[in-house]
């Protein structure tokens, strides 16, 4: 799925990454467990519908808001995150679903390479768009003047472009690793398989993907969220000017009412930080753990149903992404309620300009954290 075909050189196993093409093991046709195959198809179908529907709804809500000219910088990132997750649904889950249904890849060599390339682009883009969004929040809150000079309100901005560019570039090895290859000796049966020049190539490549798609973005997201929390917490701590006998050198300003608003914003930021990091890790960790296990352990339980099904959960994070960010953006959640009310024939609630999201550099710290 990730860095190999859905078929394997392991006998009888239809879903694990393929071994180098010089493996002496071969899997004959029609050896799949029918119950497990149906479970795989059902799981992929559910994931595809969930990813496509959830991201489509959030994109529709953003489009409605954009027609009224109410796009804020955070909406740009949420929109591109939804596009990246839709790419996961269309170019990763859907081809995988068709592949599972036919057991072998049905298509020419160019299509095999293109599918494998686009599968990886979606995975990179989904992770890197979250990282870009987090970096933008860090810049807006911790370096507001820098964010104001550069601006971030366009539909395409620098972090978005960098995220897409890295996704496209880092996926290029897929074009050279995968190809339509004979998988059953001289029988003429072909499949979209990976081939590595050295025996250690597969382990190295799987580890590299795990680091670049999961470990590095996780560390970056966690670090930025910690810095954001520290910045907001520092704004609430009375400075020397607010202590008895102190001089006016503190950072905290504003009325008690504003301080209460910032306190509520801090609580919301803490919740958002925990949700983002925990959900990101929980969604990606099972998939990459079994991928690394399969790559590094020759005795890995490749035939077990839990192992097989976990191999299919690379797109799980794409199901949760739109709802996490929509729930923490009052403007997007209000627009979603309005969209659903219109679909049911109800009168939508009015949406005021105060629902704007949070990452403009000119916003107050409270607004930056309470989107």
Swiss-Prot record:
Result of changing residue 342 to S: Reduced palmitoylation, reduced cell surface localization but coupling to G protein unaffected
Extracellular topological segments: 1-38, 99-113, 181-200, 294-308
Single Gene Ontology BP annotation: regulation of systemic arterial blood pressure by vasopressin
Record-linked InterPro entries: GPCR_Rhodpsn, GPCR_Rhodpsn_7TM, Vasoprsn_rcpt, Vprsn_rcpt_V2
Segments for region (Disordered): 1-30, 240-259, 349-371
Tissue expression: Kidney.
CC terms in the record's Gene Ontology section: clathrin-coated endocytic vesicle membrane; endocytic vesicle; endoplasmic reticulum; endosome; Golgi apparatus; membrane; perinuclear region of cytoplasm; plasma membrane
Tree of life domain: Eukaryota
Family that this chain belongs to: Belongs to the G-protein coupled receptor 1 family. Vasopressin/oxytocin receptor subfamily.
Subunit structure: Interacts with ARRDC4. Identified in a complex containing at least ARRDC4, V2R and HGS. Interacts with TMEM147.
Entry protein name: Vasopressin V2 receptor
